[in-house]
Amino acid sequence: MVAKAIDNPAPSRYTSPVQPNPSMKLSHTLAALFAVVSFAHADEKEIFNGKDLTGWEGNKDLWSVKDGAITGITPPDPADPKKGIIKHNTFLVWKGGMVGDFELTFQYRIEKGNSGVQYRSKELTPGEFGPIISGYQADFEAGDKYSGILYEERGRGILALRGEKNTIKPGVDGKKPEIAKNGLVGDNAAIQAAIKKEDWNEYRIVAKGNHVQHFINGMQTIDVTDEDTANAPKEGLLALQIHQGPPMVVQFKNFKLVESK
């Protein structure tokens, strides 16, 4: 069967436990305040009109607008309805230009599967099911492990698990980058407990220089300083993901993009 649409719309990862520390609450508050101040005097840019996909590019069989929200689906495979029909991750790409330093807030909800928002990303050769994107991803899912992490699609993989404050350093002799763990910005279990299943959640991404932060429902989920200069993207595209795998539905709305001046 087709995955039930929300409001009637048309590679292996690991995880690790995160333990809280006494300074976590103060660190989270200061980080959130800094992010707000950094973009306080910039102008907000509209990237979604709430009606149609004007300004966006992707596979129109997979992306549409339902009830004021961008809606993406992974349809079932007719030969095996438990499996999705798409064979690679694909994306809806915002065609409004390259974005470097910015703050992006949006709401999402997801039924089954995995999704995310790409930023500072680049478009690769399109696949059978639409655009293919590489770059930073603000990950989220219907499950309990990955919402809020920093993942680099078709790149360096997981750069920070939920709750981590990391510095990414260049690898030796061109090998995978070294990830220095500098403490915690949030408690893994507490962050997950604040995420509403199959309901609307607010996601915020802050990117300034080589420093990126994610927040879900006001709780900071990662803090990363990317010193791997050969691989760290400084600007790029914004895009929304449909993940290969089981049938799923994901929705996005209420985007607020503020670019730093």
Protein language model regions, located:
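Short alpha-helix boundary/capping segments
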Residues: 7-9, 31-32
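Carbohydrate-interacting regions of secretory-pathway proteins
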Residues: 42-261
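Hydrophobic h-region of N-terminal signal peptides that target proteins for export
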Residues: 32-42
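Bacterial N-terminal signal peptides that target proteins for export
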Residues: 19-30
